[in-house]
Design a protein with these regions (language model features):
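Helix-loop-helix "hinge/cap" segment bordering the ligand-binding cleft or interdomain interface
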Residues: 62, 66, 118, 138-209, ...
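Short helices/loops that flank or line small-molecule/ion binding pockets
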Residues: 78-89, 107, 161-162, 178-186, ...
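Hinge/lid segment of periplasmic solute-binding proteins
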Residues: 98-153, 314-320
Length: 459
């Protein structure tokens, strides 16, 4: 993705490095004595999240006498990867988000886990983790990671504004989304946009309109069955981008795309702040939008990130799955984009047996998952009901429904470096909506070639 900014809870973005680690690992072989059995774990967590993480690590130590786990927090993904490749990284490291999985797996920085999962001390991942979490831990057909907590992207609707316009439920299809937006959008006397129904516009808010969300709406595939980039071969990409352009023309330009594009550009430039009560969704400047699960508490209380049973914001809102192309409503409606944090075992680890024990225990610790979910509203990757709060606000329930939906997913991940395919697709979307890309099919074909070249170069 382009324009990544440091977010309070975002899994896809890197955390700042606030601690430096010197020296090499104190790692022993699997046959070492109990006194020298040490596993080192690096994670990006800080503050209360690090406290929860370290509590889980203490539980693993207590269950494995003689095992010492050295936990280091505030280490971002880039530093972990650099240290692993330099030969002085940890036994285990945590990566915040699927987009970086190809980076760690494709480069060989994380070891393959297949033999460990099916061994004596193995793990039945299908019975342990959600479907989206399982899929997210595989890169280029290789499983090199176990998933942690989820980050969920759903569709937010201003319930009051929809009701005033005569709509009782959020839009389920892309056709309904356009119809809703036409009725909800209003203009000032000078012709500028006063209230926007929905903005299919890259660069609005950080996690509002994203090319990944657009692809999810139309069921578009990032990669073909043969492993090549699917942007050209899968016609649903061209269909999705064409829908975006027609939407802008129809809702905002009175049939004129150039007019609608210019009006949206001005509207976006005047948006309110992202982190507080001036956010456009909170002021009623926009009626419907995509966003992350952790934005829900802010929309609910204004400027308080804590989960509240009852919302105190100006408008009542609802969360649902993404609107989808009409032919997909039966199978895909109710789904969204679900990402995961990941953790893997470094290629330089000499203590594979104990590292696997720690990795498996941390990934399946229901107490940690419950504490994390309760504190952050981030649904666990685990299927176990013990890994999620026994009670959470009714307004937040749709987030869990999205996680459970079989069509919820993150796109297939390959080694493109720091998720370059996402950045390239987002750049294309920005160029397309600005009218700078005249032929979307040709542009998508060029994009597929670039991504194939990047993948080939990195493998």
């Amino acid at each position: 993705m382009t324009g990544e900014i440091m977010q309070k809870k975002r899994l896809f973005a890197s955390f700042a490095v606030t601690a430096l680690v010197a020296g090499s690992l104190v790692a022993a072989s699997s046959v070492a004595t109990a006194a020298t059995r040490t596993v080192t774990v690096w994670a990006p967590y800080s503050g209360n999240n690090l406290v929860m993480w370290n509590a889980a690590i203490k539980r693993v130590e207590a269950a494995n006498p003689g095992l010492n786990i050295e936990s280091v927090g505030s280490i971002d993904m880039a530093k972990s990867l650099a240290a692993i490749n330099a030969g002085n990284g940890p036994d285990i490291s945590v990566s915040n988000g699927n987009g970086n999985l190809g980076w760690f797996c494709g480069s060989g920085a994380w070891q393959r886990l297949n033999s460990l999962m099916f061994g004596k001390n193995g793990l039945d991942v299908k019975k342990t983790f959600t479907a989206s979490a399982n899929a997210s831990a595989i890169s280029n057909g290789n499983r090199c990671a176990l998933p942690l907590g989820s980050e969920v992207f759903g569709f937010y609707s201003n319930k009051d504004m929809l009701a005033a316009a005569g709509f009782k439920t959020p839009p389920k299809t892309t056709t309904e989304l356009l119809a809703y937006s036409k009725k909800l959008t209003t203009f000032n006397s000078d012709g500028s946009i006063k209230v926007a129904g929905f903005l299919p516009w890259a660069g609005y808010y950080g996690f509002d309109m994203d090319s990944m969300w657009l692809g999810q709406m139309f069921g578009a595939r990032w990669y073909n069955a043969d492993g090549s980039a699917g942007f050209s071969k899968d016609v649903r990409w061209a269909k999705a981008f064409t829908w975006q352009k027609n939407f802008i023309a129809s809702v905002y330009g009175d049939g004129d795309f150039e007019k609608g594009s210019k009006l949206l550009l001005k509207f976006v430039a005047a948006k309110g702040g992202e982190w507080g009560t001036e956010h456009d969704f909170m002021t009623g400047r926009v009626a419907m939008k995509w966003d992350a699960n952790w934005m829900g508490p802010m929309f609910c209380t204004g400027d308080d990130w804590a989960m509240a049973d009852k919302c105190t914001a100006k408008y009542e809102f609802t969360i649902s799955g993404f609107p989808v192309s009409p032919e997909l409503v039966g199978s895909n409606y109710g789904s969204g984009v679900v990402g995961q944090a990941q953790m893997g075992i470094s290629k330089g680890s000499n203590n594979l047996r104990d590292s696997w024990t720690v990795l498996k225990a941390l990934a399946t610790d229901t107490k940690f998952a419950l504490a994390w979910d309760t504190a952050n509203g981030a649904p666990s990757s685990l299927l176990s009901k013990d890994a999620r709060p026994a009670k959470y606000p009714d307004w937040y329930q749709p987030i869990y429904d999205i996680v459970a939906h079989p069509a919820s997913a993150y796109h297939i991940v390959k080694n493109t470096g720091e998720h370059q395919e996402e950045a390239l697709l987002q750049n294309l979307m920005a160029s397309w909506q600005a009218g700078d890309t005249p032929n979307i099919k040709s542009a998508l074909a060029d994009l597929a070639i670039k991504v194939n070249q990047i993948v080939a170069r990195n493998n």
